[in-house]
Amino acid sequence: MPKSNHSTAPLPFPILIGDIGGTNARFSILTDAYAEPKQFPNVRTADFATIDEAIQKGVLDKTAVQPRSAILAVAGPINDDEIPLTNCAWVVRPKTMIEGLGIEDVLVVNDFEAQALAIAALSDENRERIGSATGDMVASRVVLGPGTGLGVGGLVHAQHTWIPVPGEGGHIDLGPRSKRDYEIFPHIETIEGRVSAEQILCGRGLVNLYNAICVVDGIQPTMKDPADITSHALDGSDKVAVETVSLFATYLGRVAGDMAMVFMARGGVYLSGGISQKIIPALKKPEFRQAFEDKAPHSALLRTIPTYVVTHPLAALAGLSSYARMPANFGVSTEGRRWRR
């Protein structure tokens, strides 16, 4: 009977690695510690009733390699033997996977733990620097990912070990500071009366911010898709879209600076996800770094902390692969999150 336990033993190879998002799931297989991961085509979560079916048809039916273990990154709380995902209908049931897919060892981690693992050793070709600060590369870091929501994860460096720290940093309060903020914030859609960072710093948050600006300026909104807003902002064809993305970058800078101070992230703050990649030109304008550094009495500290956009196309899989190869380099807690035959 499969059981949940705490184990420091390495996962046995071959290892199935999965990054499970709300819309797409990405999988690879790592055959040994020295091999390059074998990538599989992205799987649309809506195309399969269960994650087990997606793994069987999207991975196992396409390879002769039978994984002995699996490490899966999911968006959702990992509190029991059934793990519902936040943004799709799948439920991860490790015991069922072990019984039905021939896998003997399953580890489930938070999606932003995987992103945090990825930023431990990103090369320059997989990141775009924002601003001129270079920082101390062997030091604690933090990653923020505006996407379906706002994910936040820390990566603490201590005793020659990288320790990923998952959390719910995307739900911290975000309040107005400038005169323009005080005009706009009363029109931001709230959750139970409060504006969290995620109410602005994600895809739907971008639309939320755009609509609030339209209300303040007495303009009828014409866009409902975050991609439309960003594209019109970047080409300068819509003034409300331009201001929306400019303020988005400002507010992202404020939150990123806060997280840098929480984690003393001298090794850098990393922005992950498709939104960050798409708005790199806006992030390179002064607003983002100005907001990031505007943290009196610690502005001098913030000026030394580098900021990057993660450009690696499969960052979470890369982070999980790094852990799978060399688990001793990372302080990943497996208690209550690892199931073995």
Swiss-Prot record:
Task: Name the top EC class.
Answer: transferase
Q: Which residues form the signal peptide?
A: none
Annotated binding of ATP, by residue: G18, D19, I20, G21, G22, T23
Keywords, ordered alphabetically: ATP-binding, Cytoplasm, Glycolysis, Kinase, Nucleotide-binding, Transferase
Report one GO cellular component: cytosol
Q: Which reaction does it catalyse?
A: D-glucose + ATP = D-glucose 6-phosphate + ADP + H(+)
Annotated Gene Ontology MF terms?
ATP binding; D-glucose binding; glucokinase activity
Q: What is its EC number?
A: 2.7.1.2
HAMAP family reported in the protein's UniProt record: Glucokinase
Q: Which NCBIfam families match?
A: glk, PRK00292.1-4
> What name does this protein carry?
Glucokinase
From which organism does this entry originate?
A: Rhizobium etli (strain ATCC 51251 / DSM 11541 / JCM 21823 / NBRC 15573 / CFN 42)
